[in-house]
Amino acid sequence: MVKKMNEISPGRYRESFGRYYEEFVVGDIYEHRPGRTITQSDNIWFTLLTMNQHPLHIDDEYGKGTEFGKTLVVSPFTVALMVGMSVSDVSQKTVANLGWTDIKMTHPLYVGDTLYAESEVIEKRESKSRPDEGIVTVKTIGKNQDGIEVASFIRSALIPKDGKAVEDKIDY
């Protein structure tokens, strides 16, 4: 988590989160903490919220009859948690998410597992149309408590340059 304290007047500080475009270095890896232990309530809630009622995610008896032997955590929840875990390191200052590609679910995630995530900066370039911003691309990997990769994706975001973020402009 990137957290800074900015002095806004003598003896008074305001916290600031996230990275400016210039602070991203290709090859750097950010380990996102804390991890998140998945509960049955998390899984049921997300399946119902998104109207994904496949029994593999909500019916223990059905899950017992599958090759997995139990219910699985619904995949979009895994991805959503990984995105959320990465916000403070990758996209807290983002102007716009430009998209996700190469989303892969590589190993089952089960209720009771703890999900961890990390993001590697794989590319960055200045925006051709927005001189105060740049495009940063990261590969985010989710792992369970045993270090087994469960999911990955590539994400690109439009990031402001130093001093050009919304909070810089409005004294936030």
Residue ranges of each PLM-predicted region?
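Flexible glycine-rich active-site/ligand-binding loops centered on an Asp-His dyad
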Residues: E133, T137-K143, I148-A165
